[in-house]
Amino acid sequence: MSNKFGVITNDIQPIGTNNKNVENIKNRQDGLDFIKTLKDSIQDVNTEQQTSEKALADIASGQVKDLHQAAIAINRAENSMKVMLEVRNKAINAYKEILRTQI
């Protein structure tokens, strides 16, 4: 069927029925899952903190073999904790922003 503009309207599909691409995107899992990445990051921070605590205990007991490596371990743990806290703060701010959004 043609209208006055010469466009065949029978071939035009409604927007809702042509969602094959959307389904393909939903079913694809190419990247890492966000929750898994977050858990791995928290585990890494925990490992850094444990290494730092061991280095501090070795310094306190006089068993430290390399003071420079102990200082590096402590600094790494401090930096990883700062990054994790910053990620937490950003997540909390994003959550608060979503709560303020009016529908």
Curated annotation (Swiss-Prot):
Keyword set includes Transmembrane helix: no
A GO BP annotation: bacterial-type flagellum-dependent cell motility
Subcellular location: Bacterial flagellum basal body
Keywords: Bacterial flagellum
Listed GO MF terms: cytoskeletal motor activity; structural molecule activity
Disulfide topology: none
Pfam families: FliE
Listed transmembrane segments: none
Keyword set includes Isomerase: no
NCBIfam families the record matches: fliE
Family: Belongs to the FliE family.
Protein name: Flagellar hook-basal body complex protein FliE
